[in-house]
């Protein structure tokens, strides 16, 4: 058993539960409740299986060009990876190689400190305010890089384009990575700032707003130089991370803008209606610009409520983590699913009142 002495110990990321029961209302991993566009479905139906014997494009050239056109960028400003988690991982490894600490909010995507541990990146967590807002002035200090999810997860809150520009202006010797995984649901993308700042890297994903969680497509945008370094790092690990079908599906999803906008708009409308109903029930709800809400009830322990929802076959997300252990994150599903949640909460809180 001496081989165990040479193991590299890690504390892995704990993903949201993937429920095996089909009658569960799954609102814990921020998946889109609606199917991909018909154009995506047609690509899948028309895909020739014989193509699977060939390696895919190493840099997803056609999809890169489509994304560049969609966002009015040059192709060499686009990087594509196997899901945004891979893109983030490679970005941390590529850009954050300083003895100075990487700055990040204390409440944010829990993969960030895991990457830092894996790659021996020193980091410093900057506390959010009591209302979970972010103070840009806190990032005007010496650092080896900055990573901010905007909108943030799990709080759902966003900072403005002007605030991001202030951070960039005050940190021109560091890479500022903005994780825009949820940007399509109401945040303001900082992609226009790429024209002014070569130290900006923006990461996005296909799975949340385009209903493509199952194919794993993530993307980074930056200066041509930054993206070239990112590809150098990628090619040191895996030359072919994006399979042929995924590349075609990604391209098709960009070609159906009407469906995309309709799907996103529907989720936003459902979210706002759901927030209003939660507030009526006494919940505190953050100003979410994502496809989820972050909620707290002053009279109900979050762990207890999480278990009660689970027993009612409704799965949401809870973290036993400092400052947010009494909060729940609830993905926005269909109107019917969210109405079911509201009806359960009404009954649950009514019974709770009787027991006081």
From Swiss-Prot:
Taxonomy, superkingdom: Bacteria
Keyword Secreted assigned: no
Tagged with keyword Acetylation: no
Cofactor(s) essential for the protein: pyridoxal 5'-phosphate
Disulphide-bonded residues: none
Residue numbers bearing the N6-(pyridoxal phosphate)lysine modification: 208
GO biological process, one term: L-histidine biosynthetic process
Keywords, in A-Z order: Amino-acid biosynthesis, Aminotransferase, Histidine biosynthesis, Pyridoxal phosphate, Transferase
E.C. designation(s): 2.6.1.9
Gene Ontology molecular function: any one: pyridoxal phosphate binding
Family matches, as HAMAP family: HisC_aminotrans_2 (MF_01023)
Complexes and interactors: Homodimer.
Entry's family note: Belongs to the class-II pyridoxal-phosphate-dependent aminotransferase family. Histidinol-phosphate aminotransferase subfamily.
NCBIfam families for the chain: hisC (TIGR01141)
Protein name: Histidinol-phosphate aminotransferase
Taxonomic classification: Bacteria, Bacillati, Bacillota, Bacilli, Lactobacillales
Gene coding for it: hisC
């Amino acid at each position: 058993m001496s081989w165990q002495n040479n193991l590299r110990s890690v504390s892995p990321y704990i993903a949201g539960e993937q429920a095996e029961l089909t009658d569960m209302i799954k609102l814990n991993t921020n998946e889109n409740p609606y199917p991909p566009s018909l154009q995506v479905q047609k690509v899948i139906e028309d895909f020739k299986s014989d193509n699977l014997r060939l390696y895919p494009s190493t840099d997803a050239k056609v999809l890169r060009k489509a994304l560049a056109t969609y966002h009015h960028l040059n192709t060499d400003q686009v990087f594509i990876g196997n899901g945004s988690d891979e893109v983030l991982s490679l970005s941390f490894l590529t850009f954050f190689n300083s003895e100075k600490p990487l700055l990040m909010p204390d409440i944010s995507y829990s993969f960030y400190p895991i990457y830092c541990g894996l790659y021996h990146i020193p980091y410093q967590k900057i506390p959010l305010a009591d209302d979970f807002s972010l103070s840009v002035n806190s990032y005007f200090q010496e650092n080896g890089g900055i990573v901010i999810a905007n909108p943030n997860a799990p709080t759902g809150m966003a900072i403005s384009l002007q605030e991001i520009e202030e951070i960039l202006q005050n940190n021109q010797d560091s890479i500022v990575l903005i994780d825009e995984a949820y940007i399509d649901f109401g945040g303001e993308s900082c992609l226009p700032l790429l024209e002014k700042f070569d130290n900006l890297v923006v990461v996005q994903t296909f799975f949340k707003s385009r209903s493509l969680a199952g194919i794993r497509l993530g993307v980074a945008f930056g200066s041509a130089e930054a993206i070239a370094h990112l590809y150098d790092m990628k090619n040191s690990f895996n030359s072919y991370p994006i399979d042929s079908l995924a590349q075609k599906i990604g391209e098709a999803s960009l070609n159906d803008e009407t469906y995309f906008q309709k799907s996103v708009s529907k989720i936003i409308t459902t979210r706002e209606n759901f927030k209003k109903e939660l507030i009526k029930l006494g919940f505190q709800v953050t100003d979410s610009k994502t496809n989820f809400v972050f909620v707290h009830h002053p009279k109900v322990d979050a762990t207890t409520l999480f278990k009660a929802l689970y027993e009612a076959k409704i799965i949401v997300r809870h973290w036993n983590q400092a400052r947010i252990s009494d909060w729940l994150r609830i993905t926005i599903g269909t109107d019917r699913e969210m109405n079911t949640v509201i009806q359960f909460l009404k009954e649950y809180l009514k019974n709770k009142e009787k027991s006081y």
